[in-house]
Amino acid sequence: MTVTILKFGGSNFLGPEGYDRVARHLAQRRAAGENKIVAVVSAMKGETDSLKAQMLAVNKKASPSNLDAALAIGEMKSVCLLEAAVSRLGISVASLNGYSLGIRTNSDFGRATVKSVDPRRIRSALQEHDVVIAAGAQAIDQSGRLTFLGRNASDLTAVVIASMLGEHACEIYSDVPGVSTGDPNIIPEALLIPEIGYQAIAEMSRYGAKVLHHGAVEYAERHAVTIMCKSLTNDGVVTGTTVTGHGNARSVTVARDAVVISFASVAERDNRRALLDQNGITTIDVDQNDRPGLCVMSDTDFAMRLVEGTGISIGSTMVVTVLDASVRRVHLIGDYERAVSLARQLHEQMYPGAVAERLGRG
């Protein structure tokens, strides 16, 4: 049984019409001969932040397991809405969430790590139905408790499902068609990268690029899953970037939600850095108000929980990074407008003809 694996990010679901559009796309894929489809979905845009805010309003010290269970509601709601939209088109459809997907993790709530998979439940659903809607970014631990795989980790769910079903490709749909040399929302001159290697895009993700989750890319590399980045528009599907074992590109990334964690001593910083490194979290050594610190650009909630303790202070910042095959330059900027301005300047230095090239294409 050949299965098509698709993942739709929250930007596809700005309202009820988004679910209708995705459902129609699934119907078109089936009409084109793709009989079995798994569609992994994220929560509606802004839903996860809203759920977290509600939880913390009730209890600022809510347990990590309690938070994970609450955050999973966003994807579960999205699954129900898409299942309803697909069912209305007369397609046989079922849905699975973290409890039933067959993905087991450790108990690192907030950013759990996949430990084992069991494809029997999802294979059974595909035997009975033509489309299976799967909740992204969630699984269960060995005790059967819901776990959250991390922010934007629905990509990881899609890659894991592709691998566990023996498929070697999955499609990721977001509001941009692919990976670019910079965020096109803030750098209009950014150039689309047709093909890029796993390690290159994983590094971009760790330094702030939002197109793909770094954990998904790393899992895809280990299990030989090709990722195709696409965008679903009113005019159809736009294919942008294929992520495989080959390809590199210079880029400028902007991490808008980075945090700076300051410590009482250099020794304490070094100890906490080692802990974060063990958990695969990229950090940069910084000095903040004459105190040694670490800047964290991804998995920030999980990182802050790992290093929490007395004598620690936390602040926010933005990080602009130039990524090159031989050079990595990092700039910490406190103001968003200045960060965007710097990113555009650095991109222009990196690709001096980009503006003219885009105008020429237009």
Positions of PLM-derived features:
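Nucleotide/pyrophosphate-binding catalytic subdomain
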Residues: M1-V217, A264, L306, G315-T317, ...
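Conserved dinucleotide-binding and phosphotransfer motif residues
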Residues: L89, H223, N279
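Short linear loop/turn motifs
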Residues: S100-R104, T233-V238, Q288-R291
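A residue-level signal for beta-strand positions that form part of recognition/binding surfaces
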Residues: V131, A224, A258-V260
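Generic beta-strand/beta-sheet core signal
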Residues: A135, Y173, K230, I284-V286, ...
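A conserved active-site cap/scaffold subdomain adjacent to cofactor or substrate pockets
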Residues: A202-R256
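A conserved regulatory-domain signal marking ACT and ACT-like small-molecule sensing domains
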Residues: T241-G362
